[in-house]
Amino acid sequence: MVRILAIETSCDETAAAVVRDRAIESNVIASQVCAHQPFGGVVPEVASRAHLENINGVITAAISEAGCDWSAIDAIAVTCAPGLVGSLLIGVTAAKTLALVHQKPLLGIHHLEGHLYASYLAEPTLEPPFLCLLVSGGHTSLIGVYGCGEYQLFGQTRDDAAGEAYDKVARLMGLGYPGGPLLDRWAQQGNPEAFDLPEGNIRLPDGKVHPYDASFSGLKTAVARLVAELRQTHPELPVADLAASFQKAVAQALTKRAIAAAVDHGFKTLAIGGGVAANSGLRQHLTAAAEPLGLRLIFPPLRLCTDNAAMIGCAAADHFQRGDRSPLDLTARSRLSLLEISALYGPTPLAVS
């Protein structure tokens, strides 16, 4: 059994958690939604300042809620890539300081690996291999999971991530921030057949459609044109129908590709991770498509879909057990492929005592 204090500050949530293997002992999140709402999106400098204000209190609360002290913590884990560098630096600096002061091992964790591990928190008995559809504001990928640090990328978006498309379309429709949850609520009241929107196919040189990759920039442009036309012809924008039609297009595109990858590569389990995993339309489409195939679906609870430190701690527990350790010169990186996470650890894994 290993107990990890984990820190997550990759974007606009200041989070800390204490995780014991795959059990959450505390999971504290300080949201910055109110700070960014006036700007209609995340402002990096505002996010960094908020992290700086919140980080000490969040860590203290996580330790307190777990009912333990520093002597019970085996290692300190922190999201170090990818993300907003200014935000990441707050968490990385805090983690390195705590590791030095309390003489604990340090583990840098890839943010996307954390989202993969949210599925283990949802289903502690889950074992690889499985396929994960990771859909968030910054990333949309189909990833084969074969073990800790062992991943294969099958597909991704070539431009806007699904969550990014949601936020941009919500802004076009005047729904405010954060756009994804607001658009989802409107979509539940609308007619998904009201408007015919493009699915976002990627054409290959031979004219065929890429089975797993997608593009959402064209869908966003189509909605922008439609909104402009409707504002000329309608006294009021049909927000619910627009939201429902857009959500259907995104959910169909993601479902089609995830199911194809699962079937083609023999996966029996499909896990969903990232903030868009909370979307009602995506959940409905995936459930309807997976059930006839006998494909097991894993949706983390809503509190584990968005950014949190518990998922980071869960990933760190496996890396710790494997003997991975990060050097104290660990730094924040705005970009790092999930396939390159070995760069976060020392050249030789340590023996686990």
From Swiss-Prot:
It comes from the Bacteria. One of its GO terms (cellular component) is cytoplasm. CDD domains: ASKHA_NBD_TsaD_bac (cd24133). It is found in: Cytoplasm. Its cofactor is Fe(2+). Substrate binds at residues 134-138, 167, 180, 184, 279. Its EC number is 2.3.1.234. Required for the formation of a threonylcarbamoyl group on adenosine at position 37 (t(6)A37) in tRNAs that read codons beginning with adenine. Is involved in the transfer of the threonylcarbamoyl moiety of threonylcarbamoyl-AMP (TC-AMP) to the N6 group of A37, together with TsaE and TsaB. TsaD likely plays a direct catalytic role in this reaction. Belongs to the KAE1 / TsaD family. HAMAP family: TsaD (MF_01445). This is tRNA N6-adenosine threonylcarbamoyltransferase. It comes from Thermosynechococcus vestitus (strain NIES-2133 / IAM M-273 / BP-1).
